[in-house]
């Protein structure tokens, strides 16, 4: 499943936490994304 995530400045594709970089961590109740910042994957929490 793929959703659209948002950072403070732009949107980016969101992917399953299983596909996210191992340097990222899953946000509680949320999707992880291919864009990582401060070891967290930033994404909206709903599709």
UniProtKB/Swiss-Prot annotation:
Q: Which domain of life is it from?
A: Eukaryota
The biological process GO terms on file are:
defense response; defense response to fungus; killing of cells of another organism
Classification via InterPro entries = Defensin_plant (IPR008176), Scorpion_toxin-like (IPR003614), Scorpion_toxin-like_sf (IPR036574)
Keywords from the UniProt entry: Antimicrobial, Disulfide bond, Fungicide, Plant defense
Cysteines engaged in disulfide bonds, as pairs: 3-47, 14-36, 20-41, 24-43
User: Tell me, what's a Pfam family for it?
Assistant: Gamma-thionin
> What family is this?
Belongs to the DEFL family.
Q: Know the name of this protein?
A: Defensin-like protein 2
According to its UniProt entry, this protein's organism is Zea mays (Maize)
């Amino acid at each position: 499943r793929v959703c659209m995530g948002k950072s403070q400045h732009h949107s980016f594709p969101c992917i399953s936490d299983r596909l996210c970089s191992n340097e990222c961590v899953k946000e509680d109740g949320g999707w992880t994304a291919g864009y990582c910042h401060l070891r967290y994957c930033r994404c909206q929490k709903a599709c």
